[in-house]
């Protein structure tokens, strides 16, 4: 709301935290980046749409000459373990840690319980891709500006956890306090019931989960 800022989003089914956003399956179904009309699927054994993107003020960006785009489901999330591996330092305000603290506070769980369910994110507003030559993951400064937003239609009761990334617009680095960061605003709206007519309820997978163990 004040400047260019990336956010890391975790989504959970509000009454069952084991059902959570599955970025890998969403990526397999839609591609490296998602936008209007794309659904955010949940983890096994549930595999259903948790939410659908209904409005994206950055949909004009598309893909640039480097193959970069916004709202990626290829990056994971900045985390203290990778930071420790690379830099040797303990940094506690990575997106993984921010989400962990928020869930501990909101749900009253231990950090050990929470770290088992914190998952790969939707990188909201983040501009990323793979390099043309080495196919390595890259980040560039996000084109997001105050007033831009990404809108979702929740297809079940959801718990959303959004971390303001310490990388700011992620044009330089993250996992440090160097980048300029700005607040992100979350709004929750009711839907006029007339718009819900004909919409099918998102149901969990009907697979019987036998896995060939019995005849």
Residue ranges and their predicted role:
Residues 1-215:
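Acidic, Ser/Thr/Pro
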């Amino acid at each position: 709301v004040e400047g260019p800022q990336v956010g890391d989003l975790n989504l959970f089914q509000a009454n069952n935290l084991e059902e959570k956003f599955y970025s890998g399956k969403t990526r397999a179904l839609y591609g490296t980046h998602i936008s209007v009309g794309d659904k955010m699927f949940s983890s096994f054994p549930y595999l259903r749409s948790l939410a659908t993107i209904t409005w994206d003020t950055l949909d004009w960006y598309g893909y640039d000459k480097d193959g970069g785009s916004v709202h990626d489901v290829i990056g994971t999330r900045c985390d203290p373990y990778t930071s420790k591996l690379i830099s040797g330092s303990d940094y506690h305000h990575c997106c993984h840690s921010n989400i962990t603290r928020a869930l501990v506070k909101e749900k009253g769980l231990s950090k050990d319980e929470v770290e088992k369910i914190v998952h790969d994110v939707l990188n909201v507003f983040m501009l990323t891709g793979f390099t043309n030559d080495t196919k390595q993951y890259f980040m560039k400064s996000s084109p997001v500006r105050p007033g831009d937003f990404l809108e979702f239609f929740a297809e079940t009761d959801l718990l959303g956890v959004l971390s303001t990334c310490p990388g700011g617009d992620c044009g330089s680095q993250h996992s440090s306090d160097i980048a300029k960061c700005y607040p992100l605003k979350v709004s929750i709206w009711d839907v006029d019931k007339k718009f819900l007519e004909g919409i099918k309820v998102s149901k969990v997978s009907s697979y019987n989960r036998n896995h060939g163990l019995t005849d």
